[in-house]
Amino acid sequence: MKQAIQIHPNDTVAVALTDLNRGSSFMIDGQNIILCDDVKAGHKIALKDINPGERILKYGYPIGTAKVHISKGSFIHSHNLRSSLGELLDYRYHPDFQDDCSLKAPNASFYGYRRSDGRVGIRNEIWIIPTVGCVNAIAKEIEQQSQQYKKGEIDGIYSYNHPYGCSQLGEDQRMTQKFLSGLIHHPNAGGVLVLGLGCENNNIPEFKKVLGAYDENRIRFLNCQDCKDELAEGVALVKELCELALKDKRELCSARELIVGLKCGGSDGFSGITANPLIGAFSDRLTADGGSVLLTEVPEMFGAEQLLMNRCRNKTIFNKTVKLINDFKSYFMRYGERIDENPSPGNKAGGITTLEEKSLGCVQKAGTAIVEDVLSYGKPATVKGLSLLQGPGNDLVASCALAASGAVMVLFTTGRGTPFGCPVPTLKIASNTPLAQKKSHWIDYDAGQLLNEQSFDILADDFYDFVLRVASGKINAKSERLDKHDLSIFKDGVTL
């Protein structure tokens, strides 16, 4: 096994593939590098002498500037590397993409559930969605009392509780409404019970204005203040929905019907070498096959945004991307926060130093696909290909945002590990094999095999097939097996 890797020929750093001791050496591009310090796996090593203020390159792009003189063979991290990110920027459109059908996977297909609106889901579940947090406990009780009706083609009955829906104003409330509307229309739901209280800001009559047209057979409403026994009536409505969903059958569908969300969390120094490029290959293959992928966590585009902007289909999409980036920077600044204050303690422990470094690894999940659309929070994905979605870096908030925009599953890469799940199957892809082995009950796929010189193309083919099997219901995500069905909504406003 190699001791270190230079990701791009222009990089001024290498990444340690195993723990290395001071005084040990390794070869990179014909030169012998002698370590000046102990360096843990996933962390960076200087490949040349670097002067104060000089840009440090990884992935072929700057990840920050040197704080001090750094000698060849030295450990590089927060003590000698700083972010170079600015605030609001003026961007220029420099198109750098090409339509490439060479990746097309002919006849790629899966078995899914086609809904009345034409969309295709990969699960057939009954969802109970409160309009307001006041009825969360009632929703949970209805879920528990309805489990007797889970059978046959029904994959599960779940309530999705949240604390919002009242004491919200303006755009903050509209964000909640759009998010909940996205879930209610989701193709993974064979039926939905919308549970209201009656006096909330987001009461059912007001919410229906945002919800728009809906399938009256599959979406039912119940106001708890309007009935004597809300539990009995709620369970009866769920029973009716289950009777309908039992008749649903999987059918053969083209991979072009898939909408897949992309997310990373607990990233480490290997995420941008293994797991994220593997997901990028998946994204290229699915979009070439006519499918759709959604990329969010906008703060983790900072420092790599120009790469995405250069892949925008046209000037209109470019302008939307600029607005997406600068609006999120303004959101940080409005609260007096630095835009580069992102890498978490876990990220840093795993070898990531700056937000630029994190972002350059993060955007690899989108492969080389053309950016076809930019979506506001809660807006459904309707354009095939790669779309950028407004959302934060927070794992649960971002994953739920992907689901609300129509993602039927989320591919979640991680170097540290996390057990959570959102309303759709949340597949965890480990960046390193030790994590996959230690947390086999969390991790669905081991991308760390690439560090052991596994063929990238072979693993990419295997992973594409793996995702299609998950979509067909032949494999359940570990998050599903652990019964992790969590919900979190992005909030930006006052609470009355």
Where are these regions (language model features)?
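Metallocofactor- and cofactor-centric catalytic cores in central/energy metabolism, strongly enriched
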Residues: 1-409, 416-496
